[in-house]
Amino acid sequence: MEQVYYYIYNVSISFYYIFDVDFSSSFLCQGLDNVNILEEASFVEVDTIYGKPSDKLTCGKIAGVDCVLLSRHDRNHTTPPSNVNYRANMLALKEAGCTVVIATTACGSLNESYAPGQLAILDDFIDRTTKRTQTYFDGSHPERFGRICHMPMYPAFSEELRAILIAECQELALSFHDKATIVSIEGPRFSSRAESKSFQQMHAHLINMTTCPEAVLAKELGMPYASIGIITDYDCWRETKDAHHVDVESVLAMFRANLTKVTSLIVNTIPKVAAYDWKLVVEKSEKLVKNSLL
């Protein structure tokens, strides 16, 4: 199940080496504007060579750390997953000073042990989208993204960011999984049962609609990226008579029930990420991009 509302927070702090540490965190919210968790909030309209991002950047502070909030599907949720301008979103965050991205995503479970209400720190993905541009290096802007980029996608997510999130989940005593493979589908429809079962055969644990190409694009920009999966349902693969299959109403209800703990995880994680020395990680990420160009 894909998220209904998705927000990205971007956290930046200046270090001695004069580069910013930013984390983008995506967030589902129904009837709640995440600007409420920001202090000194202000709105900034930006543009990129790929057009405008999904919404204005909302700048402020969380726990004393500079943050930026961006709604992936726009604040009114009028942009379906296929039409999100992923390239503009990630580039807008990069150009705002982002170097580290933490995302959250509502997702369905393909595995009995991954129960609704639990969280998962994603560690791999399977891309089953069909309509989305997967790269910045497609020749459309050779002045900025020349050549061809053959980006290695193992690991698919930043291990450093994952470790911080896992440690914070443990500290908060949350029910979570420290690994999960997620399959991203095109949407906006949910899977058929045959599709759901086929994804199980691929050894996917979870299913959503937006991790791809977002994780790939962040990596092409040299931005370490991690994602928190918020498990809301069991998709439609269960065959017991009392099985409840995915629908919008049940997903929203489960998300609302877990909003407080996800917010707590984000707010408590931000100072830990801010305290981490990202210099070598950023250098390694940027070197990987350079070495992936042909």
Outline where the language-model segments fall.
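Active-site rim beta-loop-alpha module in soluble metabolic enzymes
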Residues: 156-200
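Generic hydrophobic/aromatic pocket-lining and core-packing "Φ" positions
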Residues: 90, 196, 212-215
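His/Asp/Glu-rich mid-to-C-terminal helical/loop segments that flank catalytic regions of hydrolases
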Residues: 236-289
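Metabolite-binding pocket within alpha/beta catalytic cores that recognizes anionic/polar moieties
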Residues: 1-3, 18-153
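Zn-dependent metallopeptidase/amidohydrolase metal-coordination segment
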Residues: 209-248
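Non-catalytic positions within long, well-ordered alpha-helices that form the structural scaffold/packing
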Residues: 94-97, 200, 219
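General beta-strand structural signal in soluble alpha/beta enzymes
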Residues: 69-71, 101-105, 121, 176-179, ...
